[in-house]
């Protein structure tokens, strides 16, 4: 019964997160952004993406930093990070009692951020400007746990990874 109760608790948390996220998507103003749907919401949230949706706050949408934010979220969508997160949520429901699965989730999100940052930098955006954007966004609001977005706690590591010399694998 304890296993079942824990699994139901994790499932309820995930469903609540989905509900809140889809409320934002449903109530936001829709705009087209390439092959994705851009949702602009009035709530002061950190930008995130899920499926084909990129969700940004009105303040982020109206600032000059919009390009960097949208490019970052587009990279998450392009690399299909939503599928990874969805699989991880299913594993969390089944193996909620195992601390390793929670660590794996955190590491997966960190790798997603590294991949998105690398994708942004590969487009030719100014690295210093992008890093300043990350620092600026790090003082923002809490993220939705089900979605990709700017990860506050790993910011220094992300910037360090961006500054590393890239060497050829071969």
Stretches with model-predicted labels:
Residues 1-170:
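Membrane-embedded and juxtamembrane structural elements of multi-pass membrane proteins
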């Amino acid at each position: 019964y304890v296993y079942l109760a824990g699994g139901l608790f994790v499932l309820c948390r995930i469903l609540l997160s989905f509900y809140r996220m889809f409320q934002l998507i449903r109530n936001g103003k829709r705009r087209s952004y390439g092959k994705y749907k851009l949702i602009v919401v009035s709530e002061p949230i950190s930008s995130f993406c899920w499926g084909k949706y990129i969700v940004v706050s009105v303040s982020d949408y109206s600032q000059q930093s919009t390009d960097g934010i949208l490019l970052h979220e587009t990279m998450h969508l392009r690399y299909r990070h939503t599928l990874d997160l969805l699989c991880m949520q299913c594993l969390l429901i089944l193996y909620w009692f195992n601390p390793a699965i929670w660590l794996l989730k955190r590491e997966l999100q960190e790798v997603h951020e590294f991949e998105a940052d690398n994708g942004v930098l590969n487009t030719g955006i100014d690295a210093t400007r992008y890093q300043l954007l990350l620092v600026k966004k790090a003082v923002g609001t809490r993220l939705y746990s089900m979605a990709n977005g700017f990860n506050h706690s790993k910011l220094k590591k992300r910037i360090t990874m961006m500054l590393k010399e890239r060497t050829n694998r071969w």
